[in-house]
Amino acid sequence: MIEVGEYKVKEGLYYTKEHEWAQVLEDGTVLVGITDYAQKELGDIAYVELPEVGKEVKKGEVLCEVESVKAVSEVYAPVSGEVIEVNEELSDSPEKINEDPYGAWIAKIKPNNLEEELKELMDAEKYAEFLKSL
């Protein structure tokens, strides 16, 4: 884990400038969630509008919304593909994102252009540098 001030950045993940993370699993699917920075900026998360299974998403488009006591924030897809699973646990316990932002994934995507799109994402070290610039 890399620490940037009060924020934690998990190594081995890919990151966007909008503070989403992507974890490539052994089977080639991708888990998506929001970063420690994002959950701290949002405050206590009250509701996660999970995407529909079967939804086709494009990198950079809205995947779902996360509602906190402060604001409603859009979560963008870090990769393109089909949503094949969602973390139903977040329907009942959205605060899990606050408790464990890198464990509480939101959706699993079957990517359709992974190799190219990963080149456009940041690794943990680059994302940590990006956080320092904010």
Swiss-Prot record:
What processes does the entry annotate via GO biological process terms? glycine decarboxylation via glycine cleavage system
Please list the cofactors this protein needs.
(R)-lipoate
The UniProt record lists the Lipoyl-binding domain at: 29-110
Note describing how the cofactor binds: Binds 1 lipoyl cofactor covalently.
Q: Which GO terms describe its cellular component?
A: cytoplasm; glycine cleavage complex
Answer whether the UniProt record assigns the keyword Nucleotide-binding to this protein. Answer: no
Q: Name one Pfam family in it.
A: GCV_H
Family, according to the entry, reads as follows: Belongs to the GcvH family.
Protein name in the entry: Probable glycine cleavage system H protein
Upper lineage: Archaea, Methanobacteriati, Methanobacteriota, Thermococci, Thermococcales
